[in-house]
From Swiss-Prot:
Its EC number is 3.2.1.8. Pfam families: CBM9_1, CBM_4_9, Glyco_hydro_10. Residues 35-183, 197-359 form the CBM-cenC domain. This is Endo-1,4-beta-xylanase C. Endoxylanase with high hydrolytic activity on birchwood and oat spelt xylan. Xylotetraose, xylotriose, xylobiose and xylose are the main products from birchwood xylan hydrolysis. Shows increasing activity on xylo-oligosaccharides of increasing length. Displays very low hydrolytic activity on Avicel, carboxymethylcellulose (CMC) and p-nitrophenyl-beta-xylopyranoside. Also shows transxylosidase activity, allowing the formation of xylo-oligosaccharides of higher degree of polymerization than the starting substrate. PANTHER family: BETA-XYLANASE (PTHR31490:SF88), GLYCOSYL HYDROLASE (PTHR31490). The gene is xynC.
Length: 1086
């Protein structure tokens, strides 16, 4: 422990020197000297002394053998060369020091002789990793101890992990008498206090004292021996009964107000679940007011049981002008209300190696265009903020006033913040925001007057007996008082109010107590018209009375991507408007992702809102880099940020459409920058996100540049997949091949030149000889010069290989058929809205195979009656075709097109196979989603005017419905897309029907539950499900394509956990919300 003691003593000198009045600026410490032992491990104390497993191995102390003494460190159970013992050196070896790392190693008896060496895994704060070899690999046997020794130094990096690796993946070995010796100290240049990298505060707990740390509640804090990170001691927190219980320490005396610092600590737990999230948080006190403290999480991470992990982030210390009088860091588990806290939430945990260092100050880019001004829109562009953005000296404030002209309080104008106790309103923070906005000529959006969340319990209880609910009259009066007191105070100062927030239930209809809201249940139907949405009507009327000129908004999430939820919103607003309710706008929160919902669906939702006669506001916009709740944290890559940038551009192009129509009021980003996003730690604990226009250092991301100057960005390469199937050009009568109806269309409409209007839509198929295209162009005027160009070549051409034939892979298809060199490769068919090009492009068989990628782009030229030209492309927004093959999109050649022809027939739904089923087509669930093996099904299909019939025989030897979750039970799921729009999110015609082996049903999307039929029967090999799925708008005299998929869920172990999922078509696992991967069924005419 000598090395750690040395570092601790130096840190103690440093901390004392930074206390006020102690002449910190003149301090110079005596550093460690050459020859000093920084770290020494003999393992005689019986602990691993901070060494942990790298990979699925066992690392423990053994008394079987030792180089000196009686014990050594043993590593067993290895399966990979890199598996072994590891030790963090982050706080042991510093930049530019030269150290000698050594240790004695020997094999456990019976292991094959491998070569062993020490390696350092070195990471920077962006996650980039280097692997530094410390010593030459030495052959080691089980006969004698071998010394591994080498010198090590580094210049860049934020974390160091030393590990022992072997050329043999299975060898078990011993380590003893490990040490790190300082060979050469780093150059002495501490500079002024606050220089980047300088330690300002450290807590190692090796002296056995808690120091100034204290509990936040009734929990117990103690320094324990035998458990530590790279040491023998750490700070343990136990007897916790609340999630916020944890160790806390005051750090403000050690920090310069207004500076940027890096906070880090290591955490570990060894009781309870396999994983647990630990948060690093701050408690802020202003003007010595201990009654109104502010809390903020600065970092969060998911720990694995028994393994230490670092929690770290940069923070900005509040400036002197804020009145900051206390800044305390603490550790906790994710917050829950007391009534929801479980034993898992209150596990004991350990903290060690706490450190705060100075870092480069965070500053905004002052020489880039002002975002709101550059957009030049008539709608307000805003951001949601916390209180730090109201401090003019904080860089977040600078970012806000430079780029935005509207502000929203993220949390401090919600109900619990404004009136925590009945009759006692808290005005301080809201007043600051309103005054700040006035001083900077900004609009204010008030968020929110009424919500089911973050509302104090007293609203809903009897004032004389809190055990009883409030009466209708009491709750109505409280609502009126709350709304009118706040709106009256800020009359003429707050431009817009979110009057009610999130009143639509995800399960359909208005929220009630079962879905988290008591407003509807208590107030109910006041006017006796049979409708219980009266509390919403009253809230709007109260707000209008208090400020007749404020814009009043009904705000909700998910309505841009859920047709059923938007249906509920439209019905509600129609009904309220008919009663004269003063609703001015519908607020679309727009918490979207890079993957959905698609622009087409958002446009449709906006159109439906505008059709009601109200305006549109985008109120909480952000764009997650994750596809859903099941995705774990991933590194942020340049390609990912470029993809996000182009999606942001598409969204703002859509906003411009509605701004030009005069119905877009405002667009608000839910946060200023990624360092303050609410999506960190939500919906997945410990997961960081990057959803906004500015990064964690407040620097402009590609998404910002996509809005102000897209030409500065590289061209993003869109991707699409072509299925394999043979297809013919239209016959002599112009009839197209029916197989095109099974193919999903790729729309493109990026205007390079001219006016918006012309659009394209392409379908792709491939076979062993050619790439087949169906390109539909919307262009109402047929003029000479109208044409479609296709640019296609093998993907490896982008690496500089010789171009294919034709030159540069360019094909020109004239609308009039023309006489060009490509005339024999295509046909053109006119239709009501424009024309369709059918083309078969011969390519080398070497380039046409599943998994191959083609470089592809499309360009439409539209000649217009006024002599001008409009040009639209799919991918190359710089219009540098055909020369720039690297600017083309990617077309991946996929597997067989999943489609089937379904014959007409009406079987009896009883779980038995009628004779009719003998003529039915059969499909199989052979596409893996999860699990390497498990239950699968063969299914037959029939249809009539009312139903699609499915007879599925599932092979599943162990049947289970142990889980309370329907999707984890042994079952099949039937997905249907009646209009075959193949969208990234469900439309009103899309539905999910689930039937388990015991004929218990559950549903998703927009099912017609009352018409659905099913029957099940157990078999020797599993079970049979026969089902009838309701159809709409089908005719027996014509064939019709619909979207369909079949899924089999299997709890293979019978333990209540789904172990495998197999599908007919869609491997994505998103079929419950996304119809784009469904297969296609052709309902053959009778």
């Amino acid at each position: 422990m000598r090395g750690k003691w040395l570092r601790l003593c130096l840190a103690a000198v440093l901390i004392v020197s930074l206390l006020p009045g102690l002449g910190a600026g003149e301090w110079k410490a005596s550093a460690a000297k050459a020859g000093d032992i920084l770290l020494s491990h003999s393992f005689e104390e019986g602990t691993t002394q901070g060494w942990t497993a790298r990979g699925g191995v066992k690392v423990d102390v053994t008394a079987e053998q030792a180089y000196q003494g009686k014990q050594s460190l043993q590593t067993t159970g290895r399966t990979e060369a890199w598996n072994g013992p590891s030790l963090s050196l982050t706080d042991v070896v510093h930049k530019n020091e030269v150290v000698e790392i050594s240790g004695y190693v020997k094999l456990v008896a019976g292991s094959a002789p491998p070569d062993l060496k020490f390696t350092v895994e070195r990471r920077d704060r962006n996650g980039d990793t280097q692997y530094d070899q410390v010593n030459a690999a030495e052959q080691v046997t089980d006969q004698k101890w071998v010394k591994l020794q080498g010198q090590y130094s580094y210049e860049q990096g934020s974390s160091l992990l030393l590990y022992l690796e072997s050329t043999d993946a299975k060898a078990a070995y011993l380590l003893d008498e490990f040490q790190i010796r300082l060979v050469k100290a780093a150059p002495e240049n501490p500079g002024e206090p606050g220089e980047a990298g300088q330690a300002l505060f450290k807590a190692y707990f090796e002296d056995g004292n808690i120091g100034n740390w204290r509990a936040r509640g009734t929990e117990k804090l103690e320094v324990v021996s035998g458990i530590g990170h790279n040491s023998n001691r750490s700070l343990k927190t136990s007897s916790r009964s609340e999630t916020y219980h944890g160790p806390l320490v005051e750090v403000l005396p050690y920090l310069q107000k207004g500076s940027t610092v890096h906070i880090s600590f290591w955490a570990m737990y060894d009781e309870g679940p396999a994983t647990q999230v630990i948060n690093g948080s701050l408690e802020k006190e202003f003007n010595r007011d201990t009654a109104n403290l502010e809390y903020a999480m600065f970092a969060s991470t998911t720990l694995n049981k028994g393994q230490w992990k670092k929690i770290e982030a940069d923070i900005i210390v509040p400036a002197e002008s804020t009145g900051i009088s206390g800044l305390r860091m603490y550790a906790e588990t994710p917050w829950k209300q007391s009534s929801e806290v479980t034993e898992t939430d209150t596990i004991p945990f350990y903290v060690d190696d706490v450190q705060i260092t100075a870092t480069e100050a965070i500053a905004i880019e002052k020489n880039i265009p002002d975002l709101a001004k550059k957009l030049g829109s008539s709608y307000a562009l805003g951001a949601a903020i916390d209180q730090t953005a109201l401090d003019p000296k904080d860089p977040h404030s600078e970012l806000l006033t430079k780029h935005f002209n509207s502000i929203t309080a993220g949390n401090f104008m919600k109900m619990d913040a404004m009136q925590p106790t009945e009759g006692k309103f808290v005005w301080s923070e809201a007043d600051k925001l309103v005054n700040f906005a006035a001083a900077n000529n900004m609009q204010v959006r008030g968020h929110t007057l009424l919500w089911h969340s973050q509302v104090p319990d007293w609203f809903f209880t009897d004032p004389n007996d809190p055990s009883k609910p409030a009466t209708r009259e009491q709750l109505m009066q409280r609502m009126k008082t709350h709304i009118q007191t706040i709106v009256s105070r800020y009359k003429g100062k707050v431009h817009t109010w979110d009057v009610v927030n999130e009143v639509i239930s995800d399960g359909g209809g208005l929220r009630n107590q079962a879905s988290g809201s008591k407003w509807r249940d208590i107030i109910g139907d006041v006017d006796g018209d049979g409708d219980d949405s009266d509390y919403i009507e009253l809230a709007f009327r109260y707000a209008r009375e208090a400020d007749p000129d404020a814009v009043l908004v009904i705000n909700d999430y998910g309505i841009e991507g859920s047709v059923s939820k938007m249906n509920d919103m439209v019905k509600l607003v129609e009904k309220l408007l008919a009663k004269g309710t003063p609703i001015d706008a519908i607020g679309f929160q727009m918490h979207v992702s890079m993957y959905g919902p698609d622009i087409k669906q958002i446009r449709e939702a906006f159109n439906r809102a505008a059709a009601l006669g109200v305006h549109i506001q985008v109120t909480e916009l952000d764009m997650s880099i994750y596809s859903g709740n099941s995705e774990q944290e991933k590194p942020v890559t340049d390609e990912m940020m470029l993809e996000q940038a182009y999606r942001y551009r598409a969204l703002f192009d859509l906003f411009k459409e509605f701004d030009d129509r005069g119905v877009m009021d405002s667009v608000t980003l839910w946060g200023l920058a990624d360092d303050g996003t609410w999506l960190d730690d939500f919906p997945v604990k410990g997961r960081k996100d990057a959803p906004l226009l500015f990064d964690r250092k407040l620097k402009a991301k590609p998404a910002y540049w996509a809005l102000v100057d897209p030409s500065t960005l590289p061209v993003y390469r869109n991707e699409w997949t072509a299925s394999q199937a043979k297809v013919s050009l239209p016959d002599r009568k112009g009839q197209e091949d029916i197989i095109w109806g099974a193919v999903r269309a790729l729309p493109f409409s990026h205007v390079i030149e001219g006016a918006v209007g012309t659009t394209g839509e392409v379908k792709t198929l491939w076979d062993g000889k050619q790439l087949n295209l169906r390109i539909e162009v919307k262009d109402a005027t047929r003029l000479k010069g109208d044409q479609v160009e296709v640019f296609v070549s093998p993907e490896d051409m982008t690496a500089g290989k010789k171009n294919s034939t034709p030159k540069d892979g360019q094909y020109i298809f004239n609308r009039d058929g023309g006489k060009g060199k490509d005339q024999k490769l295509y046909q053109v068919k006119e239709n009501k809205s424009g024309y369709v090009v059918y083309a078969s492009l011969p390519l080398s068989s070497a380039d046409l195979a599943a998994g191959k990628v083609l470089s592809l782009d499309f360009r439409i030229t539209d000649k217009q009656p006024n002599g001008k030209t409009s040009i639209v492309v799919w991918n190359d927004v710089n219009n540098q075709q055909p020369q720039k093959t690297e600017n083309r999109g990617k077309l991946k050649l996929g597997f067989d097109l999943k489609h089937a022809k379904v014959m007409y027939g009406t079987p009896t739904v009883d779980g038995k196979e009628d004779k009719l089923w003998k003529k039915a087509v059969t499909i199989t669930t052979d596409v893996k989603v999860t699990g390497n093996s498990g239950a699968k099904a063969k299914a037959k299909l029939l249809w009539d005017e009312k139903y699609l019939y499915v007879l599925a025989e599932v092979k599943d030897p162990l049947l289970s419905k142990k889980s309370a979750n329907a999707h984890e039970q042994d079952s099949i799921e039937l997905f249907i897309d009646l209009n075959k729009n193949q969208t990234n999110s469900y439309e009103e015609d899309d539905a999910q029907y689930r039937v388990n082996f015991d004929n218990e049903t559950s549903f998703g999307g927009s099912p017609r539950k009352e018409l659905f039929k099913s029957a099940t029967r157990l078999t020797k090999e599993g079970y049979i499900v026969e089902a009838a799925i309701p159809l709409e708008n089908v005719r027996t005299k014509e064939s019709k394509w619909i979207g369909f998929d079949l899924q089999v869920n299997d709890d293979g172990a019978g333990d209540g956990k789904r172990s495998s999922v197999f599908m007919w078509s869609d491997p994505s696992g998103n079929s419950y919300r996304d119809t784009s991967g469904f297969g296609s069924l052709l309902l053959m005419k009778k």
